[in-house]
Amino acid sequence: MVSPLQFLRLLLLWVPASRGDVVMTQSPAFLSVTPGEKVTITCQASEGIGNYLYWYQQKPDQAPKLLIKYASQSISGVPSRFSGSGSGTDFTFTISSLEAEDAATYYCQQGNKHP
């Protein structure tokens, strides 16, 4: 059995879009990594959203935790190994050196357009 600490789970949601919806595509869908590795996750919007992009971490039985706001702005108390970049349609989330405690589901959310 593989320890869950060896895995970084990434959430990839696909929801059929109504006219005007912004569709977010995140990749990769799953990563198997070890502590110390650099992790990069990308998120692409179906249309430009400026810098209205947020990155979250969620662990089992816990609420999502905001890590990055406005594409690249760090959140107080979040370790500096977490960073984000990008604008418009293409965004990147990076964990510079993975730690065992980082095993979780990560996802992006756009905040430019609401249903």
UniProtKB/Swiss-Prot annotation:
UniProt keywords, alphabetically: Adaptive immunity, Cell membrane, Disulfide bond, Immunity, Immunoglobulin, Immunoglobulin domain, Membrane, Secreted, Signal
Q: Where is the Ig-like domain?
A: 21-115
Write out the annotated subcellular location. Secreted; Cell membrane
Q: Where is this region: Framework-2?
A: 55-69
Question: Which InterPro entries does the entry mention?
Answer: Ig-like_dom, Ig-like_dom_sf, Ig-like_fold, Ig_sub, Ig_V-set, IgV_Light_Chain
Q: Which Pfam families match?
A: V-set
Primary site of residence: secreted
Disulfide feature: C43-C108
Q: Which GO terms describe its cellular component?
A: extracellular region; immunoglobulin complex; plasma membrane
Q: Where is this region: Framework-3?
A: 77-108
Region Complementarity-determining-1: which residues? 44-54
Q: Which parts of the sequence are annotated with region: Framework-1?
A: 21-43
> What is this protein for, i.e. what is its function?
Probable non-functional open reading frame (ORF) of V region of the variable domain of immunoglobulin light chains. Non-functional ORF generally cannot participate in the synthesis of a productive immunoglobulin chain due to altered V-(D)-J or switch recombination and/or splicing site (at mRNA level) and/or conserved amino acid change (protein level). Immunoglobulins, also known as antibodies, are membrane-bound or secreted glycoproteins produced by B lymphocytes.
Q: Specify the protein name.
A: Probable non-functional immunoglobulin kappa variable 6D-41
Organism expressing this protein natively? Homo sapiens (Human)
